[in-house]
């Protein structure tokens, strides 16, 4: 007889190798065929809702690792909620307006000037929808489940109509106005930018000290005195109309070569050193407030510069600030208070205009040099140097931006700022610092410039009467919203103003019935920031406010910000109950991923080489709330973790062959204690994993599941129970007990890991015996039982045993290293435990089996101490059983089986 044929070895068709790049698309096709998303919604109909609202990615190009991180995090949340008692629909969205699409078309050779705006916009829309289709397939390949047949897209007519109504509501409440103010202006994009569209990069700039000679000193200063300013924007000197000082600072006159130079008193030594004025002396000291309304002479032009008090002035540089109301927010504010004009001698392209005599036609950066020369010739340039500093850049073109006063449309938040700050307190922020970050942004935030001088976007629904009066009324807004809903926003460019107005519309400022329409479009952040109105409030399966917004940390100044502004403005409430933010994905060395450096990794690469499951498991394994590093080495390490999890699942499934959980199950009370321990540990795991999911702590989910597979199962339970599973009779009570625990474990383990590893969980689900549900995602997670005192005591007892077992394993490892034994079954242990450990071991059955040795004897003392126990490892007595490999002195008691131990003899004879 071949005794190996009598062993009940593991048997399953669940493959050891995942072959994920090939097998995942098959699973996704299966989900598609069975309409899994719809089936999940039907399963959860009538349950409480949990709405995660998708922040729309920009529809341009392949998805990058930031998208991968973001979408997987969202999918984990939605899949978990859908398996844990909630109806959690997921409607993916796309942001489709804005400059990058215009630029992409122009790069593709589209000649904008050869067509109408409406025709160009049609091409933009076509391109955007192609990008949506492209990205949709990549998101689906990640395993992200959602309503892809009915996404929300910001160019959809119904979305644009809702956006117009939201704008109209804000206008009706007086929050929208037109004004000429300095805004971030991108010469490279030829458009205004919002703060959310700015990123800071290092830039080398000219830094100059300039002297402004006093014209009218008000009997305080002399005509030989000069105010000394320092600036890194020489090109703004032609726009100078004033000088700001602080009423809180004292100023001193530096006397040098017969002239006086006014700077903040505390900065005198610094300025003297910077200018190299050896021998300069310090004269009279003044209060800054005394300088108000003194007049200085502009260093280049025949006009005055008014000295003003500014609360923005600090004891830095010289303590005297060059003020150009057309080129700075504080400059504008102070200038308005003192009645100064708003001079802005720079055009849309960043070129100096005729209002800057001597520099007309120069690009502003090129003008820096010429202005420096002119100042030197005028005797006003005290020093020129160059500095490297952090400077605002256009986030799309990566080119520097300027502050430039232009007529723009603004959304004012001052009337509801307090409500916003109150609402921020009501939201759950993960991480908690998000609350402080957004609070500080709104506390100090100025008005939001919402107009853009571009073609591809939602037009501002504003008309102008014959005398220039702005027309925004509930009637016109309602009519435009209806037109957009029916025809899309391109109708604005296809029809004349009069044809866009309600029939028979009149206005006293247009006696001849002539109207013009606004040519600016809305900031794209107004588009996505309207999604709570255009999606949450309009789609029947969704609700406002959403339970969760989950995006990258850059969205504190982006989508979290614009959504909160528009929602509080129109509803008085935040659009979200909770906000979770994640960091950026960096390369393996902690550098920003950049095509120019060549250090980018695309999700599609990871999926082709390793599979989406590996990318998803990586997402769960990192501290996503901070910046995370991604390299091929990271993914190789995660692949190894995945292999261990998969092998654990395979072992569990492989030992359930012929097990019927309805008839073979052993009741909990009848399980041997070691099996009760593992079953109780499983219950404890359910509680811990669900708590981690609820706290959005996916790294803890990963660690709990991985450690349970590797430490609790593979290294302990699955290791010692092989002796039961393979050796005992098929229906032996001990074997059925282990199978009962294994069945519950594999079902629970697959359910707990399903939100993170959906392909693997659903693949394995098909091989769980007796399962009738078509997909694991149509099941619900088990409830986490409350841990009883008895259960906790059981876990504590067996945890103590596992500490003892670790000590035994150390002793066995040393014996193996000394060639005393090979496999542990070749060993006999002499144990000399202390009283506490002795008492513990006295209550534990089948100690040899648990420790996987052939014999154990308790002795008074042993060779070496390990923890609480003296342990001697000897060669086992007797001979090796051919079937179970245990050493026994009782081999061959049955002459028919001379090489078998009594246990194996009994099993074989029963077959």
Curated annotation (Swiss-Prot):
Job of this protein: Catalyzes the attachment of isoleucine to tRNA(Ile). As IleRS can inadvertently accommodate and process structurally similar amino acids such as valine, to avoid such errors it has two additional distinct tRNA(Ile)-dependent editing activities. One activity is designated as 'pretransfer' editing and involves the hydrolysis of activated Val-AMP. The other activity is designated 'posttransfer' editing and involves deacylation of mischarged Val-tRNA(Ile).
Family: Belongs to the class-I aminoacyl-tRNA synthetase family. IleS type 1 subfamily.
Main location, first listed in the record: cytoplasm
Domain of life: Bacteria
Record's protein name: Isoleucine--tRNA ligase
Disulfide feature: none
Gene (name only): ileS
Annotated domain remarks: IleRS has two distinct active sites: one for aminoacylation and one for editing. The misactivated valine is translocated from the active site to the editing site, which sterically excludes the correctly activated isoleucine. The single editing site contains two valyl binding pockets, one specific for each substrate (Val-AMP or Val-tRNA(Ile)).
Cofactor entry: Zn(2+)
Subunit annotation: Monomer.
Chain ranges for the short sequence motif 'KMSKS' region as given in the UniProt record: 592-596
GO MF entry, a single one: isoleucine-tRNA ligase activity
């Amino acid at each position: 007889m071949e005794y190996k044929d009598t062993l009940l070895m593991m048997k399953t068709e669940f493959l050891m190798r995942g072959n994920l790049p090939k097998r995942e698309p098959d699973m996704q096709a299966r989900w598609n065929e069975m309409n899994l998303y719809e089936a999940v919604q039907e399963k959860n109909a009538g349950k409480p809702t949990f709405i995660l609202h998708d922040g729309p990615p920009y529809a341009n190009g392949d998805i990058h690792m930031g998208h991968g991180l973001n979408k997987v995090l969202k999918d984990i949340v939605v899949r978990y909620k859908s398996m844990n008692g909630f109806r959690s629909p997921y409607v993916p969205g796309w942001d489709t307006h804005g400059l990058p699409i215009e630029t992409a078309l122009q790069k593709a050779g589209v000649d904008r000037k050869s067509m109408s705006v409406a025709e160009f916009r049609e091409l933009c829309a076509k391109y955007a929808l192609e990008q949506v289709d492209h990205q949709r397939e990549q998101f689906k390949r990640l395993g992200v489940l959602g309503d892809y047949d009915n996404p929300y897209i910001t160019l959809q007519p119904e979305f644009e109509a809702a956006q117009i109504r939201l704008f109209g509501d804000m206008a009706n409440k007086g929050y929208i106005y037109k004004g000429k103010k300095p805004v971030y202006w991108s010469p490279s994009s030829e458009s205004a930018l919002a703060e959310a569209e700015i990123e800071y990069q290092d830039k080398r700039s000219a830094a100059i000290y300039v002297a402004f000679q006093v014209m009218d000193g008000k009997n305080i200063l002399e005509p030989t005195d000069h105010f000394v300013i320092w600036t890194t924007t020489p090109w703004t000197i032609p726009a100078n109309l004033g000088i700001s000082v602080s009423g809180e600072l004292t100023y001193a006159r530096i006397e040098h070569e017969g002239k006086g130079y006014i700077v903040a008193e505390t900065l005198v030594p610094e300025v003297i050193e910077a200018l190299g004025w050896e021998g300069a002396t310090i004269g009279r000291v003044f209060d800054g407030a005394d300088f108000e309304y003194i007049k200085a002479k502009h260093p280049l032009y025949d006009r005055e510069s008014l000295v003003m008090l500014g609360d923005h002035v600090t004891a830095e540089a010289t303590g005297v600030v060059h003020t150009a109301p057309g080129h700075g927010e504080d400059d504008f504010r102070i200038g308005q208070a003192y009645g100064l004009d708003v001079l802005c001698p720079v055009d849309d392209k960043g070129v100096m205009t005729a209002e800057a005599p001597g520099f007309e036609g120069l690009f502003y950066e090129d003008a820096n040099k010429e202005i420096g020369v002119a100042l030197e010739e005028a005797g006003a340039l005290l020093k020129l140097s160059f500095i490297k500093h952090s400077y605002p850049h256009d986030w799309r073109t990566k080119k520097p931006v300027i502050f430039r006063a232009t007529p723009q449309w603004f959304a004012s938040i001052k009337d509801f700022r307090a409500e916003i700050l109150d609402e921020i307190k009501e939201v759950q922020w993960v991480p908690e610092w998000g609350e402080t970050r957004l609070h500080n942004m709104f506390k100090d935030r100025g008005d939001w410039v919402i107009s853009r001088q571009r073609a591809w976007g939602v037009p501002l629904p504003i008309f102008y009467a014959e005398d220039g009066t702005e027309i925004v009324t509930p009637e016109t807004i309602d009519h435009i919203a209806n037109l957009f809903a029916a025809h899309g926003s391109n109708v604005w460019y296809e029809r004349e103003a009069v044809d866009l107005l309600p029939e028979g519309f009149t206005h006293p400022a247009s006696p001849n019935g002539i109207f013009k329409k606004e040519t600016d479009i809305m900031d794209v952040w107004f588009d996505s920031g309207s999604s709570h109105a255009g999606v949450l409030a309009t789609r029947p399966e969704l609700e406002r406010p959403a339970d969760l917004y989950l995006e990258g940390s850059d969205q504190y100044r982006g989508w979290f910000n614009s959504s909160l502004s528009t929602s509080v403005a129109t509803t008085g409430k935040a659009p979200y109950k909770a906000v979770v933010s994640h960091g950026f994905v960096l390369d393996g060395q902690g550098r920003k991923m950049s095509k120019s450096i060549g250090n980018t990794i695309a999700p599609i690469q990871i999926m082709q080489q390793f599979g989406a499951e590996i990318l998803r498991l990586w997402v769960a394994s990192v501290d996503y709330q901070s910046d995370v590093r991604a390299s091929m080495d990271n993914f190789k390490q995660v692949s190894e973790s995945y292999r261990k999890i998969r092998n654990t699942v395979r072992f569990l499934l492989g030992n359930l062959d012929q097990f019927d959980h309805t008839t073979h199950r052993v009741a909990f009370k009848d399980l041997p204690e070691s099996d009760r321990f593992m079953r109780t540990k499983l219950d404890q795991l359910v509680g811990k994993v669900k708590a981690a999911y609820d706290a959005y702590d996916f790294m803890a989910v990963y660690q709990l599941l991985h450690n349970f597979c590797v430490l609790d199962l593979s290294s302990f339970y699955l290791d010692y129970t092989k002796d039961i599973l393979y050796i005992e009779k098929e229906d032996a009570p001990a074997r059925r007990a282990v199978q009962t625990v294994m069945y519950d474990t594999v079902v629970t383990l697959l359910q707990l890991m399903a939100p993170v590893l959906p392909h693997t969980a659903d693949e394995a689900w098909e091989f769980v015996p007796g399962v009738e549900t078509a997909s694991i995602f149509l099941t619900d997670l088990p409830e986490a039982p409350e841990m009883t005192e008895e259960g906790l005591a059981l876990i504590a007892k067996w945890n103590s045993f596992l500490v003892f077992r670790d000590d035994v394993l150390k002793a066995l490892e040393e014996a193996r290293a000394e060639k005393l034994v090979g496999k542990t079954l070749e060993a006999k242990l002499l144990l000399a435990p202390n009283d506490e450990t002795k008492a513990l071991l006295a209550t534990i059955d089948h100690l040899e089996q648990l420790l996987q040795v052939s014999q154990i004897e308790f002795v008074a003392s042993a060779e070496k101490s390990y923890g609480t126990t003296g342990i001697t490892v000897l060669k086992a007595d007797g001979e090796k059983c051919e079937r179970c490999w245990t050493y026994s002195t009782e081999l061959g008691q049955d002459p028919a089986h001379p090489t078998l131990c009594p246990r194996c003899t009994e099993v074989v004879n029963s077959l």
